Amino acid sequence: MNLLKKTYVLKLYVAGNTPNSVRALKTLKNILETDFKGVYALKVIDVLQNPQLAEEDKILATPTLSKVLPPPVRKIIGDLSDREKVLIGLDLLYEEFLEREEEL
């Protein structure tokens, strides 16, 4: 068993407190607490309050989820309601599979 766990750094870009933003955050927190409890850092960025951060990271639409670490950077734009699509899109499902294989 690998005692040194990876830390996943994620940024969720939202536009205010809209239903899409609230749903994206709720779904993402559910995924993270279920599959990555204790090994993630999530920063929620409201592009209406911090447009410069969205511009720096080239965010064109919300909600956008960005996996910053571990590399490579991956982004998902739009609906985050499908757990498997989120994990595959961020290249986390494959990493999760490999880590479980190593533990066996």
UniProtKB/Swiss-Prot annotation:
Keywords: Biological rhythms. SMART domains: KaiB. The gene is kaiB. Key component of the KaiABC oscillator complex, which constitutes the main circadian regulator in cyanobacteria. Complex composition changes during the circadian cycle to control KaiC phosphorylation. KaiA stimulates KaiC autophosphorylation, while KaiB sequesters KaiA, leading to KaiC autodephosphorylation. Phospho-Ser-431 KaiC accumulation triggers binding of KaiB to form the KaiB(6):KaiC(6) complex, leading to changes in output regulators CikA and SasA. KaiB switches to a thioredoxin-like fold (KaiB(fs)) when bound to KaiC. This is Circadian clock oscillator protein KaiB. Signal peptide: none annotated. The keyword Phosphoprotein does not apply. Has 2 forms, fold switches to a thioredoxin-like fold (KaiB(fs)) when bound to KaiC. Belongs to the KaiB family. The KaiABC complex composition changes during the circadian cycle to control KaiC phosphorylation. Complexes KaiC(6), KaiA(2-4):KaiC(6), KaiB(6):KaiC(6) and KaiC(6):KaiB(6):KaiA(12) are among the most important forms, many form cooperatively. Undergoes a major conformational rearrangment; in the free state forms homotetramers as a dimer of dimers. When bound to the CI domain of KaiC switches to a monomeric thioredoxin-fold (KaiB(fs)). KaiB(fs) binds CikA, leading it to dephosphorylate phospho-RpaA. It comes from Picosynechococcus sp. (strain ATCC 27264 / PCC 7002 / PR-6) (Agmenellum quadruplicatum).
